[in-house]
C-alpha cells in the first residue's frame, strides 16, 4: 500500500477538491514498521450537511480494507470547500508522540 494508491482510490470514490496525505510514521515509536501513521486532509463538497463523525465514517468505510491491520493511526481532517476557505487552512500540525519510560 502506498500513499498514492490511497489517494487515487479516494479520488475515484468521492468528489474531491483537494487531498493531501502525509506519512507521520517517523514521529512515532512504531516508525520502524513502515507506513503506520497517516494524516489525510480532504476537501469535498460531498461533506456538505454531514456531521464530522459522518464524514469520518465515510472515509473510514472506504479505506477499511486497505488499512486493516496495517495502519496504527489515521488522522482525518475533512472540510467542505467553504469551510476550508473560511479557515484559510494550509496544513494541519503534526502530532508528535514521545516515548518516555516505555509509556506514551
Curated annotation (Swiss-Prot):
<dbReference type="Pfam" id="PF01722">
    <property type="entry name" value="BolA"/>
</dbReference>
<dbReference type="InterPro" id="IPR002634">
    <property type="entry name" value="BolA"/>
</dbReference>
<dbReference type="InterPro" id="IPR036065">
    <property type="entry name" value="BolA-like_sf"/>
</dbReference>
<protein>
    <recommendedName>
        <fullName>Uncharacterized protein BU473</fullName>
    </recommendedName>
</protein>
<dbReference type="InterPro" id="IPR050961">
    <property type="entry name" value="BolA/IbaG_stress_morph_reg"/>
</dbReference>
<comment type="similarity">
    <text>Belongs to the BolA/IbaG family.</text>
</comment>
Amino acid at each position: 500500500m502506498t500513499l498514492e494508491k490511497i489517494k487515487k482510490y479516494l479520488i475515484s470514490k468521492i468528489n474531491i477538491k483537494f487531498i493531501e496525505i502525509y506519512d507521520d510514521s517517523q514521529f512515532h515509536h512504531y516508525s520502524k514498521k513502515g507506513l503506520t501513521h497517516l494524516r489525510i486532509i480532504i476537501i469535498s463538497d460531498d461533506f456538505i450537511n454531514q456531521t464530522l463523525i459522518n464524514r469520518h465514517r465515510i472515509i473510514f468505510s472506504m479505506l477499511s480494507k486497505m488499512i486493516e491491520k496495517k495502519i496504527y493511526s489515521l488522522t482525518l481532517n475533512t472540510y467542505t470547500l467553504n469551510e476550508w476557505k473560511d479557515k484559510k487552512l494550509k496544513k494541519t500540525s503534526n502530532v508528535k508522540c514521545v516515548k518516555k519510560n516505555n509509556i506514551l
